[in-house]
Amino acid sequence: MQLQKLVNMFGGDLTRRYGQKVHKLTLHGGFSCPNRDGTIGRGGCTFCNVASFADEAQQHRSIAEQLAHQANLVNRAKRYLAYFQAYTSTFAEVQVLRSMYQQAVSQANIVGLCVGTRPDCVPDAVLDLLCEYKDQGYEVWLELGLQTAHDKTLHRINRGHDFACYQRTTQLARQRGLKVCSHLIVGLPGEGQAECLQTLERVVETGVDGIKLHPLHIVKGSIMAKAWEAGRLNGIELEDYTLTAGEMIRHTPPEVIYHRISASARRPTLLAPLWCENRWTGMVELDRYLNEHGVQGSALGRPWLPPTE
């Protein structure tokens, strides 16, 4: 694969800027979710089973222990980003967040923070806290779970916020100089390629620094799993994902960094689509598609040109 020559990928961007590989270490801060505990809603998003992306056992270790454990699993990098991934990693009092984030950046070879959260859980005090780390020279990314820009779909999947909320949070963060990475799902019920391209267009118009693309995973324990088991919902086919994600990438300005272009999960948590079991399948197909149809930005007449070494 030659994805770095076809897409402005985060890994390549980090290597160019730091002069060596930088790896994300995922952390569990013990946070909950306001869309599950009643603060905003109950039941959570219809696609969600946090076990599909988070090791719940991690929450019983300290931040330092988690980072040490994760670093031992990585032998290709010596510098790291601390990634608070599970649940809503800004859903706590600011002093609690400060303590956790400080524990993370205090560990050896940590060069930055990536904080995953909902767009309705980022008050000014949290943005100001993240700016403190940015101003100290740390790489800071605010990763916002948007999934789609269509309010009808957001309501259908029980997100508990609308697109305008995402826009407000993104604009406030970027006005402070914080980098924003938007998480988008391809294959949501009622959405096809046209809707996904509209979402991309609205995200780019709002202003964004990074994007994560994710095929819809139907996972055990989610509300969507019940619809799938009843035959009312199907997982996205690999061909459809490749076409839609490929066109989204081709319509993305070259300066926007792709943090991810596909995602995997393991059985028995993953119910469908089973091609998502293999982390490479989606990337290999997208590599082929972009080689045939054009690189990131090519549909805009602004093709991605990887920097020369």
From Swiss-Prot:
Pfam families: Radical_SAM, Radical_SAM_C. GO terms for molecular function: 4 iron, 4 sulfur cluster binding; catalytic activity; metal ion binding. Binds 1 [4Fe-4S] cluster. The cluster is coordinated with 3 cysteines and an exchangeable S-adenosyl-L-methionine. InterPro entries: ELP3, Elp3/MiaA/NifB-like_rSAM, Radical_SAM_C, rSAM, rSAM_horseshoe, YhcC-like. It comes from Escherichia coli (strain K12). Its cofactor is [4Fe-4S] cluster. SUPFAM superfamilies: Radical SAM enzymes (SSF102114). The keyword 4Fe-4S applies. Residues 17-254 form the Radical SAM core domain. In vitro, can cleave S-adenosyl-L-methionine into methionine and 5'-deoxyadenosine (AdoH). This is Protein YhcC. Signal peptide: none annotated. Keywords: 4Fe-4S, Iron, Iron-sulfur, Metal-binding, S-adenosyl-L-methionine.
